């Protein structure tokens, strides 16, 4: 009688065989998570990735693989549950901080900030996490990335009509980039935004800032950004709305006026030319 040989799969070996190592079990759970993600079962994927990370932490509380699993869980939950995604990223931050992976900590804070800004619409919490990201980037010597985070805070501050804080940030970043050869001429944008922020509440302060920037950075006076703000300031001083509108149209012809700048121009227009508009 011919003997029949049964081929036992690794799954059943693990199921009925001796206990498996926790890393192997976590790997199996992670594999399941990837399968869930491949068919867009985001909640199942997120829970499985998180479980995998949790299992790895039981073996090693400073497991970088666990932190990576928490980030994967966050990416899955981001599709369906912003708050759960934040919880997963916060868990990853704890591990990365213990490991001294501060650049990655900064990236996690950036991701949390973006969720608060774009999905949950809680600007104060977004600002808090951008500040954290800026601090960690700066501590690791990534000064441009640190400044980029601060610029995001400045733009959110404009949305909150905190023009003083926004102006100070734009000014500081402008100074920082002014002293760096590769980004020296980028500073003209930050200086323009700083003056616009100040102009939203105080024409005299805006004028003083313009004079100061031209003294510190003589090349600034030759840039179109400087010429634009000079025309805007002149229009505000004389309360000439035609000059104000003409300056904006001229600048817009060769430049993109983004949402933040447009918001400030509308604020300035309303505050300065309210009678003329009516």
Swiss-Prot record:
Give the Gene Ontology MF terms in alphabetical order: soluble NSF attachment protein activity; syntaxin binding
A Pfam family annotated for this UniProt entry? SNAP
According to the UniProt entry, the coiled-coil residues are none
Q: Which residues cross the membrane?
A: none
Domain of life, per the record? Viruses
Q: Which CDD domains match?
A: SNAP (cd15832)
Q: Which InterPro entries match?
A: NSF_attach (IPR000744), TPR-like_helical_dom_sf (IPR011990)
Q: Which UniProt keywords apply?
A: Protein transport, Transport
Q: Which GO terms describe its biological process?
A: protein transport; SNARE complex disassembly
- What does the similarity note say? Belongs to the SNAP family.
* Matches recorded under PANTHER family: ALPHA-SOLUBLE NSF ATTACHMENT PROTEIN (PTHR13768:SF8), SOLUBLE NSF ATTACHMENT PROTEIN SNAP (PTHR13768)
State the protein's name. Soluble NSF attachment protein homolog FPV011
Species assigned in the record: Fowlpox virus (strain NVSL) (FPV)
């Amino acid at each position: 009688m011919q003997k029949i040989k049964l081929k036992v799969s690794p799954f059943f070996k693990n199921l009925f065989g001796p206990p498996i190592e926790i890393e192997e079990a976590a790997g199996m759970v992670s594999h399941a998570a990837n399968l869930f993600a491949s068919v867009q079962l985001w909640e199942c994927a997120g829970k499985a990735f998180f479980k995998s990370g949790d299992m790895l932490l039981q073996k090693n509380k400073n497991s970088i693989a666990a932190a990576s699993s928490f980030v994967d869980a966050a990416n899955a939950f981001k599709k369906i549950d912003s708050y759960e995604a934040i919880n997963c990223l916060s868990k990853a931050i704890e591990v990365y901080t213990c490991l001294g992976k501060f650049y990655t900590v900064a990236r996690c804070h950036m991701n949390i900030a973006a969720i608060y800004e774009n999905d949950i619409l809680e600007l104060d919490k977004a600002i808090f996490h951008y500040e954290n990201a800026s601090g960690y980037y700066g501590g690791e010597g990534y000064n441009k990335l640190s400044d980029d985070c601060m610029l995001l805070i400045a733009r959110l501050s404009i949305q909150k009509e905190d023009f003083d804080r926004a102006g100070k940030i734009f000014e500081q970043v402008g100074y920082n980039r002014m002293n760096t050869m590769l980004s020296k001429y980028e500073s003209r944008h930050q200086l323009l935004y700083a003056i616009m922020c100040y102009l939203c509440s105080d024409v005299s302060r805006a004028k003083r800032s313009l004079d100061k920037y031209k003294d510190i950075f003589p090349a600034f006076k030759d840039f179109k950004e400087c010429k634009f703000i000079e025309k805007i300031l002149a229009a505000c001083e004389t309360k000439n709305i035609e000059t104000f509108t003409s300056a904006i149209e001229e600048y817009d012809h060769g430049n993109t006026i983004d949402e933040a700048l447009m918001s400030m121009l509308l604020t300035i227009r309303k505050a300065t030319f309210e009678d003329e508009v009516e």
